[in-house]
Amino acid sequence: MTKQPDDWLDEVPDNENDDDDDEIIWVSKSEIKRDAEELKRLGAELVDLGKNALDKIPLDDDLRAAIELAQRIKKEGRRRQMQLIGKMLRQRDDEPIRQALDKLKNRHNQQVALFHKLEQLRDRLIEEGDDAVPDVLNLWPQADRQQLRSLIRNAKKEKEGNKPPKSSRLIFQYLRELAESEQ
């Protein structure tokens, strides 16, 4: 048995560099598993998408090929392919993929919100008349002031005469065309 020299304790390095940047963040095994399961669910959502929707999501070639293969495979092979897709997602930044997927999911909600906004603008145009036209022109400079003013006048006459709101619908359609031309 060898004996340790008496000065072996003096060689223990001091922690002179106590930088916060070098701090190791401890992650539990359960948290790693939860993250892996979440990425597998993300992969399953990607596999369930159609080709047109998949084209709108920023994927590299390897991941796209794996997803397309998983769409063709059935039964047990599909499960293994889903595991592979989850593993591929763990090696990549998944945030752009999540954002694109959320955008696809929320497209309907965004469209409904846009329609509500356009309806409110239409109602404001009918109520305030020519005073609200500059606001529309600020939003869409290409808007035709004369056409908008005539539609507003007709909508006011229809409202006063308790007639069907044909011009009101035309104002909404015109505003929707302006909003779509902007996108």
Curated annotation (Swiss-Prot):
PANTHER family attached to this UniProt entry: UPF0307 PROTEIN YJGA
Similarity comment text for this entry: Belongs to the DarP family.
Name of this chain's protein: Dual-action ribosomal maturation protein DarP
Keyword rRNA-binding attached: yes
One GO term of the biological process aspect: assembly of large subunit precursor of preribosome
Keyword field: Cytoplasm, Ribosome biogenesis, RNA-binding, rRNA-binding
Organism: Cronobacter sakazakii (strain ATCC BAA-894) (Enterobacter sakazakii)
InterPro entries with a match to the protein in the record: DarP, DarP_sf
UniProt-listed SUPFAM superfamilies: PSPTO4464-like (SSF158710)
An example molecular function term from Gene Ontology annotations: rRNA binding
GO cellular component: cytosol
Domain of life: Bacteria
Feature: compositional bias, Acidic residues: 7-23
Cited function: Member of a network of 50S ribosomal subunit biogenesis factors which assembles along the 30S-50S interface, preventing incorrect 23S rRNA structures from forming. Promotes peptidyl transferase center (PTC) maturation.
Location of this chain's protein in the cell: Cytoplasm
CDD domains given in the database record: YjgA-like
Region of interest (Disordered), residue spans: 1-23
Gene3D superfamilies recorded: PSPTO4464-like domains
